[in-house]
Structures are given as structure tokens and as C-alpha cells.
Amino acid sequence: MSDNLKLRPYKSTDAETIVSWIKDERALRKWSSDRYGDYPITAEDINHKYLDCNGDCEEPDNFYPMTLVDEGGPVGHLILRYTDEAKSIIRFGFVIVDDSKRGRGYGKKMLQMAIRYAFDMLKAEKITLGVFENNPSAYYCYKAAGFRELSTGKSFMIEILGEQWKCIELEVKREC
């Protein structure tokens, strides 16, 4: 893994690279659930969602798409968005790493950097995310970065590609 990793704000030019990491519809759905329509998606689809929909947030300054870069360019991506009016809870979403770099610590590092950003810069008290049970590599990456299953064991089912997928809720809280 590169020592020169930086988490920076998303640029519209990142979308082409992100789209190239999504190799099939199953990968798209694991990444985005039902948030996008038909497969394949385009760079314009991502940019439209980020600019026009503002990440399903109702107020400005609630949505933070970020890109992990090394000396060669983008290697990972995720979004951060507030889920409450008090701006104390951040939800991570659209978490993805360049498929050629998976299993090498990039995802864990990106999440750790994003956690630090959410706590230190955005002043969050808690960060949440959802992961599909059929995506064990992502689940274990999130756990390695510090996320834990909710004590309530909260999860829900969603129909994707004609199947019932279980989504497990994870969180990490600010340490006192």
C-alpha cells in the first residue's frame, strides 16, 4: 500500500474511475443498494446524484463525497452525510475501493481517515453504515476499521436482483 494516501473532496472527474471499478450489476448493488436504476451506471449518473440530489439530504452542507488518492490517482471513494438535524450522526455510504487494490489495506485506511475527518472536522458523535451480509469482505473491512454491530442487532431485508439481501447496521462512536 502506498504511503502517500490522501482523502480529499470528490471531483466530478473521479466518477469515470469509480464507474470502472463496478464490474457487474451484483457489484453495483452491493455498492449502492437500490440507489441507482439500471446497470451499467455512468459517470454522469454519479455526478447527477451528487449534485442534484445532494445525497438525499434536505439541507446544504450535509453531504460530503470523498475520494482516496495515491500518487497514481483515485483508489477509493465514499460519501459522508449527516442523518440528524443536530448534526451529530454521520452515515457513510457508497464505499468502494479500486478492485485491483482490494485486500491490501486501502479500504481500512480510507475508512480510518474518514472516521477521523467525521469526528475531528465534522464534529460527529457517531458514524453509521450498512453492509450486506453477502459482502463479507466489506463487513470485515468495516470491523477492522473500528465499526461494530449495533447492540440491538439491527438489520433489515431488501429485495435486490430478485433475492432477499440482509443489510447489517454498523456504527462507531466517538471515544471520550
How should these model regions be labeled?
Residues 90, 125, 132-139, 144-148, ...:
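C-terminal "cap" of GNAT-fold acetyltransferases
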Residues 3-5:
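Extreme N-terminal starter segment of soluble prokaryotic enzymes
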Residues 109-126:
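Conserved acyl-CoA
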Residues 9-15, 20-102, 111, 117, ...:
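Acetyl-CoA-dependent GNAT
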Residues 7, 131:
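Conserved SAM-binding loop
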